[in-house]
Amino acid sequence: MRKITVFLVIVSLVFLILGFSAFGQNIKYGGTLRVVYAIGSNLIPNFSPYNPSPINILPLIYESLFDVNILNGQTTPLLGTSYKWEDNDLKLVVNIRQGVKWSDGTPFTANDVAFTFNYLKQNPSIDLSGIWAPSSYLESVQATGGNVIFSFYKANTPFFLNLATRPIIPEHIWSRVKNPSEWDNPEPIGTGPFIVKNVNVPNNTVTLTKNPNYWMKGRPYVDNIAYTVVLSNTTALEMLLANKADLVGAFIPNIQQIWANRNPSINKYWWPVYSINILLFNTLKYPFNNSIFRRAVNFAINKSSLEEKAYYNVGGTANPTGIIPLQLDKWMDPTLTPLASELGSYNSQKAQDLLTSIGFKKNSNGRLVGSNGEVLPTFKILVPVGATDFITMAQIISENLKNVGIYTVIDQEAGSTYMTSLMSGTFDMAISSGAGIGPSPYYLYYSEFNPAFSAQIGQTAISDYSRYTNPLVTAALQVFSSTSDLNLQQQAIYTIERIMLMDLPFIPLTNRTMFGEWSESNFTGFPNESDPYSYSEFMGYAGLYGGELMGLNVHLK
């Protein structure tokens, strides 16, 4: 087999790769950073990286090979120092950092990395990110000297994200755990910058303290992190306003007025866009199987109103391609920008003209009648019960569509029932968050358009709930995943974008954001819009694992 080696050169000097503005300056050490998150439940002191509902601060304890910033695609070395694709992109070779110790003083080696992934293979119930799923095409993981080699039986370069962000566990601890899905790991041993100091269940607080064996000299700056969970966004806001928190993760309505404007020099927030909210069509049902009808619906919806009423204009309206803002420069086909701009506009007359072009007209009651003389029925817009933002958007969409003769009602279903309706295809339209997040648009398109994830109505779809498939899109997805050549990958994404804008299998509505609010009364160095070196939240989820860089960079004023 012809051997092609593609290197991603990553400088191992931490002060260069992390890009921390504070490095080399006169930094003030110490202090306890008070972090409050609204998670809707009380603290469950489970420190297992295999917990389906992981604790947010897990990345401060268990490091991954790399930090992959899904906002902008930036990759930062952690336990891995560099990587390269070999053998026609069938092998991923990761160089493992030397001189690292686990928090109990045991040396960390490449064997720990190989063990982490093979442990998932031995225990499929904890393989939450599908490392060994058939669709990953992963064949083996082996440690060789200071490297770990991931071998694939079919090229799948986007899967780097899953491998790079998997928390690495110590073999000398976990090899003795026979039922990992049932173990809550009360005394976690990691390589990260912090260790667990205290757990106070009545106060819903975990206190972390510096790991004395951490490999990065001079980091972290803060001595401790007190992580508290609360039931509601309101409680989190109250703690922030009362100076009982330094960093909060919560949705705060009208954040600019309620928080930032009170003291602009100190009260800060950054809600970076990481995904989108979409209006799903059931494209196997009439009239949503007609792309012109879908285009008319798109023009009939005032997306700016959705953003204003549901999200107070913080996240912005979504790009019609579904690409998030920080990825547009790299992945948006510039020749499609005018079309995307047009499709993002609100134009009720354009919607009416499109409907007329395919034989629809309004009757005396203002309802659309098809060319067959039948009045369109009242359609349902499916939303989860209690999801106030989705409900608000559904109400506006319903009014917008009524203006062009499409009558709808809002169908609120409980979370599990809502998901069942999406997966089985028993809906007309639905508001949902876009499936698939990652450092490029590929992850959205792969989740939404992969035929393997679709199904006929009544059968279970994994993630292609619109049930839209297109052989040209499928081919482009295959081109992207089979190469590490950026130019080829960009062309593949351009192809999908064009089809997306022509067919509109779903409508991107508004951007989804992370929620990070903080006070700079005591601490500074948080990521922000001008320095997006990390997320504005700690994230411990499979596929969305990060925030360690924020924990390393924040310091006393």
Report each predicted region and the residues it spans.
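N-terminal lobe/hinge region of extracytoplasmic solute-binding protein
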Residues: 36-87, 118, 189-191
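Local pocket/hinge segments that shape ligand/substrate recognition
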Residues: 38, 163, 249-354, 371-375, ...
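Surface-exposed binding/hinge segments that line
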Residues: 84, 95, 130-176, 521
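Ligand-site clamp/hinge motif
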Residues: 182, 213-258, 398, 407-409, ...
